[in-house]
Amino acid sequence: MIPYGIPSLVLFGACAPLAAHMADHWNRNGMLTVFFIGIGLSSILTGFAQSLLQIGFGLAFIGVFASIYHPVGIAMVIEGGGKIGWRLGMNGLWGNMGVAAAPLATGLILAHFDWRLAFIIPGSVSILIGLGFLAFVRSGGARPPEATRQEKEFVEFAPGWQRALVSLTLVTAAGGFVFGAMTFIIPRLFEVRMQGISTDIAVTGTLAALIYAVAAFAQLVVGRTIDKRTIKPVLIFVAVGQPLFLSLMAMQTDYTLFVVSLLAMCFVFGQIPITDAVLAQYVPDQWRAKVLSIKFLINLMIGSAALMTARYLLSTGAGFEAVMRVLAIAACFIVGAAFLLPKRHKTW
């Protein structure tokens, strides 16, 4: 099945710039409606597939429509200024909760029905959400927030934007590498290093899921902080914590490993709202969807490379220590990028 899912992943990233272009020349609310209904219809069609090839086409269409959210949805979240950090943190938290809930919902459907309904039921829900959002838009409820005075005056790239985007690119690349590898490595690390707690893969898997769920709330804390303080010192703090705790993870077992892993993932998750807030400081609204689409594409490509790197190192017998050292080194680039970021007060 994996080869039939690859085109979906490729299109998920490759179509993001196209989605941004269409949103800029049409309408962000309209594109988000297309996102919900398009994913829903594609998922339902996949559920009615009669061959692996048809499943591959269905998954590919899901990837195309799924590519809309990050460049268009995030641009909507940061539109208008105000408490951007809190909104980004809340958006990221809901996204991570959705990722955590997906395998649980799929498992429940498969336990009581079959694989077809695992596509048809979520697809139907997505269409209903899309229709609800469309009605919300038509009623006038989805108007963008009233822009702050600073946001209204922010029509050109801010001074220092070139240096800021270089910093943002480095943070995105190195952060995507760390995040992509950590989502793969933690369940496997717990399975091997938590023998003193349990040898049941269901228990260690649940502990890994708990790490992701709890650490996701760090986005709210960081989001609130960057609404009140200058971004650069917050990014430096979040960046420095990553190589520190990633290095410590290589040497821990059982309960200590759980605590250190939780702290490491809090710093990893905490970085997510910061990068989009940096973008909001330096990039005017009319360019944000385009820059977000490129940022998302870089993140997806590097994350995939991180996954392959982790698998390769483990297959060669290098062990988890080697993987965690590589991740700690990658995280050091985030620290360097944080110091490279210009110091600038909020523009929202």
Go through each PLM region and give its residues.
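Extracytoplasmic gate region of multi-pass secondary transporters
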Residues: 163-216
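Conserved MFS/SLC helix-loop-helix module at the cytosolic interface between two early adjacent transmembrane helices
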Residues: 13-50, 226-229
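Cytoplasmic helix-loop-helix junction between adjacent transmembrane helices
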Residues: 58-95
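A late C-terminal transmembrane helix in Major Facilitator Superfamily
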Residues: 282, 286-317
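Interfacial helix-cap and linker-helix signal at transmembrane-aqueous boundaries
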Residues: 22-23, 108-113, 190-191, 225-226, ...
